[in-house]
Amino acid sequence: MPASRGAIGDAIENLLDPIHAYFLHPELVRRATRACPVDVEFSVEAYQATVRYTESREGMTLLQRLTEGRRTVSWGRYRPPTQVQFGFEDDCGVQAMITVIFSPVDVQTTRPFACFSTRRGRLPAWLKRLAIIAFHRKVLSQDLAMLALQADQLEHFGRPNYQQGPVDMFGPLIWVGLQGQTLRSEQRRLRLFDQA
């Protein structure tokens, strides 16, 4: 994957942000017409933070339905200082997983290294590989453009004093993890888009 302009913490948070897919990747990763309710379980242990999302299939795009099959749960995991994982599960267990390790090139440039793993299925591996590359090329280009825009804005206006809301689950943990500190244990449940 190409290096991206943007601080390592911003790149990690971009990947783990549960809301950005609706705005940055409409119709690719999430439906643009409306957000469907998502039940969220958030768990923090000393050396990792995991969030599990349970959502109905009506919130999924056609591409997700084709590539993720009968997915029932998806999850994101942050392992300090720079590892992120995503998993997609169905009734038979983990169906697909993405592991990304972020490496700082300099203060404002980050290079991600990604590994995609899928369960053996009917499609040949070479076809799955081509589909994954084609789909993620567009998603990655959108993420890189947004990180560059964010870096430009931070350079021009300075780092803002963000207010933390209920869906800002990973932001504070990422900054703690990047400092080499132990994460503080926490358990939380919430529902996103309950009024959708």
State each model region's role.
Residues 1-196:
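C-terminal catalytic domain of Rieske-type non-heme iron oxygenases
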